[in-house]
Amino acid sequence: MKYLIKTLCVLAVLSLYSCGESDSPSGGKPTKPAFAKGADIGWYTEMESKGYKFYSASGVEMDCPSLMKPLGFNSLRFRVWVNPKERWNGKEDVLKKCLRAKELGMKIMIDFHYSDFWADPGKQNVPEAWTTYDLETLAKAVADHTSDVLNTLKDRGVDVTWVQVGNEVTNGMLWEKGRVNDQSASGFAKLFKAGADQVKAVYPNASVILHIDNAWNMDTLQWFYSLMANNGVKYDMIGLSLYPSYWKDEIKAFEPWEEKVNQAVANIPQLIKSYNK
């Protein structure tokens, strides 16, 4: 049966970031940091190359990043692939998008997939150039790739606020060496640390995000983040994807989305309390 994704919400920055408190500049009552409202528009350069154009509600043509600001967005996420078959989401394409975001004064999240194409809970394929690597060599490749991309951005004056070390890594990344299951997460922990250490080396103030899916499923969330704690995985923020509604052929409609959204929202304060993130 073919399922159609209706919605993807990345909740870590869009929700958890707004929940903590920081000291007031005047020394008074602590204030909450500004809410980060963001979107992943990593596909827009490819769309532009194919002739797609973007317009405001009033019909004014704008480039996609510029269109985000009047819609109330202040943050953008860009995914990174290692050696994509086409240039999209490779280092130079990501740099171009980040420079545009910088011009607009928007905060930036970098999302490392550590793959040549999409990585998600159902596929975490090792980049073709890395397929013969053992765990030690793979960890070095993760570190080198992370450092290379981030230093390229930093050298061009781009500031990065958040970095995802892996994308939807519920079942690990860089399979099989970095697979996560009930028996083991040690390989993943080593690979994640290799990436996270380089994030802090290049951007010491950037938040390292540990990102999984199924924000509505508290059993999965507790299993995963407790397993990470037991394996000594260090990170700054929890990142969650939410797919609240899929197409159901038997009813010829999308399933109701409200229950999963409400459950995801209810899970966030519990995660903050349990894992101090």
Describe each region flagged by the PLM.
Residues 114, 171, 244:
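Short, glycine/acidic-enriched loop or turn micro-motifs at the edges of active sites
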Residues 2-10:
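Sec-dependent signal peptide recognition
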Residues 29-107, 113-142, 148, 239:
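N-terminal substrate-binding region of glycoside hydrolase catalytic domains
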Residues 82, 212-214, 241-244:
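Residue-level signal for short, function-critical loop segments
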